[in-house]
Amino acid sequence: MRFTCEKSMLLTGLNITGRTVAQKSTLSVIEGILCRADAALNLTGYNMETAITYQIDAEVTDPGQCILPAKLFGDIIRRLPEGPVTVVVDDNYKVSIRSGYASFTISAESAEDYPELPDVGSGRSVSIPQSALKDLISGTIFAVSENQGRPIHTGVKFEVEDNTISAIAVDGFRLARRTYHTEDPTGRNMSFVVPAQGLKEVEKILTDNDENASFVLGQKHILYQIGSATLICRLLEGDFLDWRRVVPTNCPIKLVAHVGDLTSSIERVGLIVSEKYKSPVRCLFGSQVVQLRTSTTIGAAEDQCSIAGDGRELEIGFNVRYLADALRAIPSEEVVLELTNGLSPIVLTPAEDKFDYAYMVLPVRIKNS
């Protein structure tokens, strides 16, 4: 095998595919990067759950394939001078790497035992701007469950309907939903749950521009095509929460607050709350103001924030981090807070109608003081 390509392109491919190379496996071959050179150069990392293949424009003079040591090969390419890199692999899997005056010789492995990637099939793809898909993921993934007792909730559920693509995450204490309204009908009606770990890799590859990404749904896997990268991820199976039944509607109390001001107040009173010293933030919603306070064995904190509306002196306790996470995910300057009573969830939505997002946080029971 022999190919020549630009260092910058090769390094980009190694950085992306290296994230799904298995760290430790009984199948040692997947601890390396599959390098296949034919019409183009394709690099693949696969940990048996998620696979990423990255295609690079290269001058291939001798087609072939091998398994390259991921860390060593990546470190070498990273330190080479800018410009073209030539890689030659002989029949004994000795690898020669040359760029400028620098040259290296390392060992590779046969690709004969590298596992086949899952066959997703050739179903109809759904396209979405990269920035929109990135927004769906970043706006929900923080709310996935870390409890392996309910594996289905360790992923994000996607619901594709005629003109919308929604992402929903729940962890038993909060819920996050974002919906993207497509310009053209998707022509599909389906739902599936993608593991958070796989989505984190998708998010890292996505850009903030409006170039399209696409995905194809298979029986047990999903394939994302993002520019030169192809990611295949195993889907989660099980019964996801019927989220529409748990999100309150027609809440009698609706308040409006400045996102930045309310977030800052919550973060301030949350300074004395930690994993060791847990305590809810007590929110007293009054007329035109919400008073925030919390106390732990290490101290106490109070603050207040202006709001529009009358909270009817309703006092509710919330997990500090969950409330702050929801506020940080609100893209508008103002947030609408919807409340019912001290034992019902709070629903947060952007004040601007152009954002179809919603966040729900369950209350924490507080003692009268």
Ranges and model annotations:
Residues 1-369:
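Structural preference for solvent-exposed beta-strand-turn elements
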